[in-house]
Amino acid sequence: YKRQTYNGFLSCVFESFAEKETPAAILPVDEADQTCLFGAKYIETDLRRAERVRVSIPKKMGMEAQDLLERAFFTCMPEKELRMLEFMRLGYKVGRGVCGRLTEPAVDKITKAVQFLEREAHLYLGFLRFAEYGDVLIAQIEPKNSVLPIIAPHFINRFSGEDFMIF
């Protein structure tokens, strides 16, 4: 399967359940074209299908699972989409207690990856320094995870009257 965004990932999840198949990989479009030996199945992002999956997560697994999955998408965990799909399959099977099943490999991997993401984001909140370039405050980061969506609200509130950029 190929995916590009979180909605794209949720579209892949819908397709996996609808077709009763487990993909060998879920990859970004550019990566799938280069690494798939036997070809790839391109899954078009379908917002209606993605929304059906998104709405089903808190209903079946609870808000904690929804938050965990949304944050897991920002991690640098290898094959995160497959791990997320494994987590979701388990969650649909066992229900709201899924996040507490830390002995399950799917839950353990996702939980540890999200903890790593949150620790890294927390470090950037405390140690990120800005430099003035004209009227703009600029900070450069080199995160392992995609922490910017996690830390952005903090800096938007902190610098509400300032022009700033984090890259």
Per-region residue spans from a language model:
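Conserved small/polar residues in nucleotide/adenosyl-binding loops
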Residues: 1-4
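Short N-terminal binding/cap micro-motifs at the start of the first secondary-structure element
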Residues: 6-12, 16
